């Protein structure tokens, strides 16, 4: 039997009585954001909206994005990454569990020196994939060209944010590369590994 999202008390500044809000709403008010599912347009828009709203509310308080995601759609993932670069507060990224595919791309997009992985977290990077294998030839060629552009974008970002040479990142993106937290730190995807 599912229990749903737990409710916790929250007292707004200036109010005497606390109201009950879901735990994520309460955590958002503390600037703690969660990416705990596959990336699609809906979750991307929710996170973007929260980051922009919290940035407008107070541009001096940093944001924390906790990631446990198998990855997902490329364009919505890039939109999250771009928003992280756009908002004024620094965005800390924290990998707990798994940051795979676009999840690792978002993880590497945190403020440099403020990217963290839990000790048993896993990170996986690879090139973008397409789901259009039954398309007409003309559509497939256009899709392949777009995929190459996206791959170039992702590769460039990994190179800039990890400090790895282009040839290393390009070669690694040819396949699924899984890393432990310490391996992700050595690669430059995260800066710190939390202690056990």
From Swiss-Prot:
It comes from the Eukaryota. Coiled coil: none annotated. Its EC number is 3.4.21.92. GO terms for cellular component: chloroplast stroma; endopeptidase Clp complex. GO terms for biological process: protein quality control for misfolded or incompletely synthesized proteins. Keywords: Chloroplast, Hydrolase, Plastid, Protease, Serine protease. GO terms for molecular function: ATP-dependent peptidase activity; ATPase binding; serine-type endopeptidase activity. The keyword Protein biosynthesis does not apply. Disulfide bonds: none annotated. The active site is at residues 101, 126. It catalyses: Hydrolysis of proteins to small peptides in the presence of ATP and magnesium. alpha-casein is the usual test substrate. In the absence of ATP, only oligopeptides shorter than five residues are hydrolyzed (such as succinyl-Leu-Tyr-|-NHMec, and Leu-Tyr-Leu-|-Tyr-Trp, in which cleavage of the -Tyr-|-Leu- and -Tyr-|-Trp bonds also occurs). Cleaves peptides in various proteins in a process that requires ATP hydrolysis. Has a chymotrypsin-like activity. Plays a major role in the degradation of misfolded proteins. HAMAP family: ClpP. Component of the chloroplastic Clp protease core complex. Belongs to the peptidase S14 family. This is ATP-dependent Clp protease proteolytic subunit. It comes from Atropa belladonna.
């Amino acid at each position: 039997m599912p229990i749903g999202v737990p409710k916790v008390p929250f007292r707004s500044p200036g109010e005497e009585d606390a109201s009950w809000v879901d735990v994520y709403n309460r955590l958002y008010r503390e600037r703690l954001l969660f990416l705990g599912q596959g990336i699609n347009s809906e979750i991307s828009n929710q996170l973007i909206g929260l980051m922009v709203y919290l940035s407008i509310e107070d541009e001096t308080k940093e944001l924390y994005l906790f990631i446990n995601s198998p990855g997902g759609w490329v364009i919505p993932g890039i939109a999250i990454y771009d928003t992280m670069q756009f908002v004024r507060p620094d965005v800390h990224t924290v990998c707990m569990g798994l940051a795979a595919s676009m999840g690792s791309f978002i993880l590497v997009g945190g403020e440099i020196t403020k990217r963290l992985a839990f000790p048993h977290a896993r990170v996986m990077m690879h090139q973008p994939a397409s789901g259009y294998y039954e398309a007409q030839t003309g559509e497939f060629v256009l899709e392949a060209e777009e995929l190459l552009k996206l791959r170039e974008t992702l590769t460039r970002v990994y190179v800039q944010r990890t400090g790895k040479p282009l040839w290393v990142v390009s070669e690694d993106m040819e396949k699924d590369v899984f890393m432990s937290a310490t391996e992700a730190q050595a690669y430059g995807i995260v800066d710190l590994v939390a202690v056990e």
